[in-house]
């Protein structure tokens, strides 16, 4: 094989690597191919979202669910009102969703990740400690007050904690109509069927008694 052929082969291999690793990193939801496609939630979703409704009206493009107040009398002292394709079908194929997140004093939105979206948010009221962790276990965090904004890169574990003495509120947005949410405590200890104790005791370097106690708190 000549030097020119070897160089050409290496160049093609390099292009293949670029295509495999770079192009997926730029993607989020697929781009729409029409002005809108209000989701028909009675139909089964496809890979790009729900099929379009046969007829639409102005009400399909407006949503009032981000108002408050929400009931924050929950175990974690937090409540979320989502505006995603399942609650607001007008978002179907548009690659966008939002949440209203409200905290009681001391309330925590526990460590979780959104596998299909980057998250951006703004504090509407209160003081919120926001943090996310990178894949090398570095924590980036800051206390934010009303009017201040944060961003969490796609898929990274993050949390929010109301460090104030009064309620706090965030409005968050995502570059996906259905970003998904994997909440670490309930994912690990409340799965159905449950993760075997042997896996969890080894992972967390603890015993069956501790694992069973945690499972009892997150049992579905």
Swiss-Prot record:
Keywords noted in UniProt: Apoplast, Disulfide bond, Glycoprotein, Manganese, Metal-binding, Secreted, Signal
A single GO cellular-component term on record: apoplast
Limits of the Cupin type-1 domain: 64-212
Disulfide bonds: 37-52
Domain of life: Eukaryota
A Gene Ontology molecular function term of the record: manganese ion binding
InterPro entries xref list: Cupin_1 (IPR006045), Germin (IPR001929), RmlC-like_jellyroll (IPR014710), RmlC_Cupin_sf (IPR011051)
Gene3D superfamilies: Jelly Rolls (2.60.120.10)
Stored CDD domains: cupin_OxOx
N-terminal signal peptide: 1-27
Binding residues annotated for Mn(2+), in chain numbering: 112, 114, 119, 158
Record keyword Metal-binding present: yes
Main location: secreted
Keyword Cell membrane: no
Compartments, as annotated in UniProt: Secreted, Extracellular space, Apoplast
Subunit description: Oligomer (believed to be a pentamer but probably hexamer).
Alphabetized PANTHER family for the sequence: GERMIN-LIKE PROTEIN SUBFAMILY 3 MEMBER 3
Function: May play a role in plant defense. Probably has no oxalate oxidase activity even if the active site is conserved.
Assigned protein family: Belongs to the germin family.
Protein name per UniProt: Germin-like protein subfamily T member 2
Organism: Arabidopsis thaliana (Mouse-ear cress)
